[in-house]
């Protein structure tokens, strides 16, 4: 009797592994979380968060782009080697400050964010070298670009944080697939800005994407979809008042309430 039960029991236990059921997948992810160790900062980056008090002092958000231009210039004067704005500028500034902001962006390597929206519009694929077949990648349904005068003076990359099955973010795409090619992520564009290059290399295999590479830097291994597991790093932070940015690439975000959504991760909200 017991022998007759063994096979059905084994089949039942194996089914979640075969079909990757939700509980099994969550268990795998939680196990991964427990094994991940916090990494030491590279020393190359600093985060500058626009705070609630900054927004209040300037009468609301978004700031006029003349103000953003001044922030950019101040950062460069304090020794920043580049600036990444984790925000998009898809519409003209109602105060007419776009030309001033564009000029400030040209003073140092600068990166602007783009965001997904199902508009069926995509940036032109440029500076992309593919070794292998065009397979793998996460398709996007549309992207909102920055206005021409700003993107002509900067890099622009897509900022997206797709969640895993338990609604936590662990993997970030380093690029996304468009109908006519590829568009690099915000992080990939920062690497290009830091090295002063206009191109990157995608290497694929039979299963999908294998790695991406930016000249002068080691290749970055990805999963088949072009995603990189996040390495948790307690990156140094500064403020508009302190501006401790000498020798760093500055990534500008905001912690002010209601401006940008927070991202849930295994280590808390970002």
Question: Which stretches of residues belong to each language-model region?
Answer:
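Substrate-access "cap/lid" subdomains that shape
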Residues: 202-242
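Charged, glycine-rich intrinsically disordered N-terminal tails and low-complexity linkers that flank
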Residues: 1, 176, 229-233
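Non-transmembrane functional regions of envelope-associated proteins
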Residues: 2-216, 245-270
């Amino acid at each position: 009797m017991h022998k007759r039960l063994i096979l059905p029991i084994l089949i039942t236990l194996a089914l979640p592994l075969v079909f990757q059921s939700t509980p099994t997948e969550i268990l795998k992810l939680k196990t991964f979380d427990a094994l991940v160790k916090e990494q030491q900062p590279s020393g190359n980056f600093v985060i500058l968060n626009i705070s609630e008090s900054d927004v209040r002092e300037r009468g609301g958000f978004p700031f006029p782009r003349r103000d953003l231009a001044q922030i950019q210039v101040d950062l460069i004067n304090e020794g920043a080697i580049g600036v990444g704005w984790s925000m998009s500028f898809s519409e003209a500034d109602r105060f007419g400050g776009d030309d001033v902001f564009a000029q400030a962006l040209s003073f140092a390597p600068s990166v602007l964010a783009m965001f997904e929206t199902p508009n069926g519009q995509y940036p032109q694929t440029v500076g992309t070298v593919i070794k292998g077949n065009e397979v793998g990648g996460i398709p996007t349904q549309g992207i909102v670009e920055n206005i021409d005068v700003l993107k002509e003076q900067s890099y622009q990359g897509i900022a997206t944080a797709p969640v895993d099955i338990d609604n936590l973010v662990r993997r970030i795409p380093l690029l996304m697939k468009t109908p006519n090619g590829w568009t690099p992520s915000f992080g990939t564009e920062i690497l290009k800005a830091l090295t002063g290059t206009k191109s990157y290399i995608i290497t694929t295999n039979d299963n999908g994407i294998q790695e991406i590479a930016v000249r002068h830097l080691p290749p970055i291994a990805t999963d088949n979809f072009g995603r990189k597991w996040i390495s948790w790093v307690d990156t140094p932070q500064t403020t508009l008042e302190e501006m401790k940015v000498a020798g760093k690439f500055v990534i500008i975000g905001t912690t002010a309430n209601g401006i940008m959504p927070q991202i849930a991760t295994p280590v808390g909200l970002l």
